[in-house]
């Protein structure tokens, strides 16, 4: 009877249809274009891109909160499409919104009035160092930085992360605009190296 009861219980479990829940939150609505344009002021403009006539800006949560929210929305869409994503309604974390936040480098399409893609980054000179001598970075859980690295490399290093290209610019839907999306982002990274004389090294995930 014991074996029969066990077999029957297993049959009941096998015949039970599991309840499937969707852990993904609904992504927030797009930030209105006029709100974004109001925050993309000339003082945040870094350069024009070499191709596609797009614009590169550098913003932070403190000076452009709506632009950063839109970045979080677009990141989540792009990462979900690649099988990832945070599952939250937008992809922002404490490194984006803290008192000493990562800067956000974005490519802006002035014709379509939308963000093409972006990176977030923080200069070595701005790293916050803990009592253990380790920097508080998004990659800190992946590495233990040696004393030599912190002394000889960190001051001249930029940590990069959360790179994305907006979904529509990952295809041919935007023609040449889409083809050169990554080139445009690299234009921005190149400009950072030029305007920041301390930068020699780039790393990230």
Predicted ranges, named:
Residues 20-62:
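Conserved N-terminal entry element of GNAT/NAT acetyltransferase domains
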Residues 48-93, 104-117:
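Short amphipathic alpha-helix that is part of the acyltransferase structural core
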């Amino acid at each position: 009877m014991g074996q029969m009861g066990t077999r029957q219980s297993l049959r009941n479990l096998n015949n039970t249809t599991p309840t499937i829940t969707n852990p993904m939150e609904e992504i927030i609505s797009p930030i209105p274009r006029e709100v974004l344009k109001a925050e993309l002021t000339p003082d945040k403009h870094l350069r024009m891109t070499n191709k596609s006539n797009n614009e590169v800006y550098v913003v932070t949560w403190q000076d452009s909160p709506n632009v950063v929210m839109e970045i979080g929305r677009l990141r989540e869409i792009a990462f979900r499409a690649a099988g990832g994503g945070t599952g939250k309604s937008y992809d922002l974390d404490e490194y984006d919104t803290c008192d000493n936040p990562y800067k956000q480098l974005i490519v802006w399409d002035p014709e379509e009035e939308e963000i093409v893609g972006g990176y977030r980054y923080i200069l070595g000179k701005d790293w916050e160092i803990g009592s253990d001598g380790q920097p508080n970075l998004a990659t800190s859980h992946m590495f233990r930085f040696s004393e030599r690295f912190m002394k000889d490399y960190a001051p001249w290093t930029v940590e990069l992360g959360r790179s994305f290209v907006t979904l529509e610019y990952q295809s041919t839907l935007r023609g040449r605009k889409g083809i050169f999306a990554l080139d445009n982002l690299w234009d921005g990274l190149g400009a950072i190296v030029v305007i920041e004389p301390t930068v020699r090294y780039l790393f990230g995930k």
